[in-house]
Amino acid sequence: MTDVEAIVQRYYGDRPVLQRIEDALRAAGVDPEKPSHRDLWPFDQLHSRGIAATREHAERARIQPGMHVLEIGCGLGGASRYLAAECGCRVAAIDLTPKFVEVARIARKAAAMKRMIRTRRV
């Protein structure tokens, strides 16, 4: 593990991310086993300006159905799910943080997007 990876793991790795998301979904009246990609927006857009920024980037990149997109630093996979669902593209998503990749995979499966998104830890 490099120094950068160790710093990222220390900062992000020990938080009970999945449990917090499941609790928040239940509180919002959403079944955590079957959320839509939109149900996850309040929790999975970890970058500044959230879903608005994701939309703007997708529009500026002119992402079209059938395209293949690489998301580097996917976090919980929110932008990947947005791009796959709203733009109709396939996404390869990568991140350094094992727990984020785990949550991204669980959310991808729960939102029935497993065939459209491949998520890996690098």
Predicted regions and their residues:
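Generic structural marker for isolated residues within well-ordered, non-membrane alpha-helices
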Residues: 21, 54, 80
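Conserved alpha-helix/loop element of class I SAM-dependent methyltransferases that forms part
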Residues: 30, 47-67
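Short, charged N-terminal helix-start/capping segments
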Residues: 1-11, 65-76
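Class I SAM-dependent methyltransferase SAM/SAH-binding core
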Residues: 68-122
